[in-house]
Amino acid sequence: MKRKIRKGVFETNSSSVHSLVVSNEGRESSKFKLNKDGEIEIDFGQFGKDERIYSSQYDKLSYLITCLYYLSGYDISDIYDKWEFEQIQDAVCKYTGATGIKILGKQEPEIDHQSQPYGDIEIINVYDEDAVINFVFNKYVSLKTDCD
């Protein structure tokens, strides 16, 4: 029997189980500049129907914040009260040493590639600190938008 050992890969012998494993080896240090209060300043993004790949830390965090805008009833002040925002902010601040995330709200938010209504941030598990950190800071993780 031939055996193949892959580091950092979870594998089962079941053909009906599929896993996605992201190695922590791709984590980069933060590229965010902190404001005078030690906060990361982020604005909403425009994530349309065009086919595009977003790889920068700023774009990936902006995507999460833009998702929260839609989950919060289209109100910036309500985002700060969302449990999901607290989870994302805690993970990002722990990783970067920032004191918080400040949403600028200068740009009009847009997510136009998703055909399902928003009920949750399904792109990552915000309960899992490592998932948040890997999504934002791992150079091997990108966000691809497209239209179905």
Segments and roles (model prediction):
Residues 2-26, 147-148:
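Short, extreme N-terminal segment that most often corresponds to the first beta-strand
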Residues 22-23, 35, 43-45, 104, ...:
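A structural detector for beta-sheet-dominated domains
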Residues 14, 36, 139-141:
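Prokaryotic Sec-type signal peptides and long signal-anchor helices
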